Amino acid sequence: MSEIGTGFPFDPHYVEVLGERMHYVDVGPRDGTPVLFLHGNPTSSYLWRNIIPHVAPSHRCIAPDLIGMGKSDKPDLDYFFDDHVRYLDAFIEALGLEEVVLVIHDWGSALGFHWAKRNPERVKGIACMEFIRPIPTWDEWPEFARETFQAFRTADVGRELIIDQNAFIEGALPKCVVRPLTEVEMDHYREPFLKPVDREPLWRFPNELPIAGEPANIVALVEAYMNWLHQSPVPKLLFWGTPGVLIPPAEAARLAESLPNCKTVDIGPGLHYLQEDNPDLIGSEIARWLPAL
């Protein structure tokens, strides 16, 4: 495996969305179907820095920073999932994207799947990894992260950990990558959240995870897009790693059997942020898959 790059060699682009500026990467040819890369918590378009170069020679690659994250503006919001839906919907319309291929991860997967379910005629393919799915009980949450995420979801304790101590950036993120993240990489991820007041989205997201039936509105939304995925013929590309976090190998095997038109790719060792452990394989497999769509 080649050395994993730490640089972010992309010019900044901004678009006004619902009165705020959202930052995004935009590279590659303008003809053909654009590929929309959606990150999750607590990351940004930086997560895709070593994957986009594999895809950009042939396809337009667009990677926004979700509202309140990365280089996007940080309005005074509660940062519920529905807030992100509103801003992402408006972002896609502001850029005039008629059809897209989605490349999605973590909460970016929930946003992407939810958008695809509502706009199926505009989706040519979905590549996904470590995506948000209903977790029926805490026993199915990875043991190494169980107590931490239960604490994140305990009102005062969770805010102390994530808002005051920055525990999602300093703890959860590096613990969910197999290799050690460098200080340069960690500083890229720290940069948007140096001030506690800006960490609201980092706290909200783990409290929206659909675990053990709560919160009910997110469980229902995620179950709805999972039902759609199991019925939709849209081409799917699922990356998984060992041991994984949200999609362990056994779950990947079940999905390979149950999802129509789904190809799976084993990236080797990986936890949650697979893009930080084997980006070249992910990027090259996406580039190989796209021409058939």
UniProtKB/Swiss-Prot annotation:
It comes from the Bacteria. Pfam families: Abhydrolase_1. GO terms for molecular function: haloalkane dehalogenase activity. Gene3D superfamilies: alpha/beta hydrolase (3.40.50.1820). The active site is at D106, E130, H272. Catalyzes hydrolytic cleavage of carbon-halogen bonds in halogenated aliphatic compounds, leading to the formation of the corresponding primary alcohols, halide ions and protons. PANTHER family: CIS-3-ALKYL-4-ALKYLOXETAN-2-ONE DECARBOXYLASE (PTHR43798:SF24), MONOACYLGLYCEROL LIPASE (PTHR43798). This is Haloalkane dehalogenase.
